[in-house]
């Protein structure tokens, strides 16, 4: 980064605004010697907006596998054979509520019900709504990730007690055709907009390390800023055997930290949440909170095991951070 780029970075931090596209690209291209200053800028922005509270979330995979979509990273796609993902139908109402009961033993702000497939519809959607409607007084907020739902379905979901809807853009619009061909980027954007119109908070981010350029990572960050999403979950590719991306080399720890910082600096008012792939940070996992994260997904992911929540709670305590609970 040159002097003007660093000045633009700090002007944004001290002014309470976001960095521009040029500065965002320069952040991703920063040298290792500039890492500390960039993390300091991102951390300062996070502390001013969110303080020392961290939002924890977890998910339940309530329908797995046999997905009609061809997302190149996903073990649940029916297009790819030999992946390790389990396949099972939608859980019963009682099974979904059992998942929520177990989740309530941890200090979560959000717990999300996730299903494979393009979109959950009809009686299946009613089934999830019934399960959630009977659990309004839980210690956490209900979240759902049920695919490309239309406005009426999202409204029904909100009326059942769901507070937040998760629906990633996955990648920049210019790179999306390399990620999925069975539905469009525009469909994903429309779902996000409809969720907001239905009164839901929106958790919307993407998956990094798919082969996209630095410019395309910035493109995704700017798209999320334009959509004014509430939470940005950042996932970093875990190459899964049997998928087209099984041989892609994961991002290195310092590149992951710079990527987190860039998303924070472009989105000063949104939660930035570390989701899948943080094992790639190895010994630097706690650095995510210096890079701009104020949210963390805990427990297992959709098709990959995570680490125990006790380990994460100890990490937060060691960092002097506190857990934010249901509003």
Swiss-Prot record:
Gene source species: Maridesulfovibrio salexigens (strain ATCC 14822 / DSM 2638 / NCIMB 8403 / VKM B-1763) (Desulfovibrio salexigens)
Biological process, per Gene Ontology: biotin biosynthetic process
Broadest EC class assigned to this enzyme: transferase
GO function terms (MF aspect): 2 iron, 2 sulfur cluster binding; 4 iron, 4 sulfur cluster binding; biotin synthase activity; iron ion binding
Stored PANTHER family: BIOTIN SYNTHASE, BIOTIN SYNTHASE, MITOCHONDRIAL
SMART domains in alphabetical order: BATS, Elp3
Family under the similarity heading: Belongs to the radical SAM superfamily. Biotin synthase family.
Positions contributing to [4Fe-4S] cluster binding: 67, 71, 74
Residues given in the record as [2Fe-2S] cluster binding sites: 112, 143, 203, 273
Record function comment: Catalyzes the conversion of dethiobiotin (DTB) to biotin by the insertion of a sulfur atom into dethiobiotin via a radical-based mechanism.
Subunit record text: Homodimer.
Reactions mediated catalytically: (4R,5S)-dethiobiotin + (sulfur carrier)-SH + 2 reduced [2Fe-2S]-[ferredoxin] + 2 S-adenosyl-L-methionine = (sulfur carrier)-H + biotin + 2 5'-deoxyadenosine + 2 L-methionine + 2 oxidized [2Fe-2S]-[ferredoxin]
Family annotation (SUPFAM superfamilies): Radical SAM enzymes
Protein name: Biotin synthase
E.C. no: 2.8.1.6
Limits of the Radical SAM core domain: 49-275
Pathway: Cofactor biosynthesis; biotin biosynthesis; biotin from 7,8-diaminononanoate: step 2/2
Note describing how the cofactor binds: Binds 1 [4Fe-4S] cluster. The cluster is coordinated with 3 cysteines and an exchangeable S-adenosyl-L-methionine. Binds 1 [2Fe-2S] cluster. The cluster is coordinated with 3 cysteines and 1 arginine.
Keyword line: 2Fe-2S, 4Fe-4S, Biotin biosynthesis, Iron, Iron-sulfur, Metal-binding, S-adenosyl-L-methionine, Transferase
Domain of life: Bacteria
